[in-house]
Amino acid sequence: SGSFDPITLGHVDIVTRAAELVDEVVVGVAMNSAKNGIFSMDERVAFVNDAVADIPGVEVALVDGLLVDFCTEMGADAIIRGLRFGGDFDYELQMAHLNKAMSGIETILLPAGREFGTISSSMIRSAACNGGNVSEFVPEMVNAALHERFPH
């Protein structure tokens, strides 16, 4: 799960690899009140649906509340999270322990691919709003929406 504001090719890579490991992947699009988003929840869900449409065994759902509650409702056996280079590991490990303690659900951490390890949605937002070309980091639909949102 994530806020996917916007979804990046790094996210798509993690979903693709996760789908190779398990029978079914549910991508949870979550609200994150701590982040200032640029796209609405409906837009984000649409972008994620479009980006993962060709990956077998993947569905997209809205997460409203705790991730572990969502996982329990969906009958999930595990949470799969991507790790970028740098500081993600410590945070994700803490969350994995908390989620396990609250629900018994395990977390699988997948390292980002080399080409995606430094990409984050916040970096994409920052670059796009300042006129940067982010086309090699986001799905085509997202790139078009960013150009519409931040015309330069």
Map each language-model feature to its residues.
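Nucleotidyltransferase catalytic core that binds NTPs
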Residues: 1-152
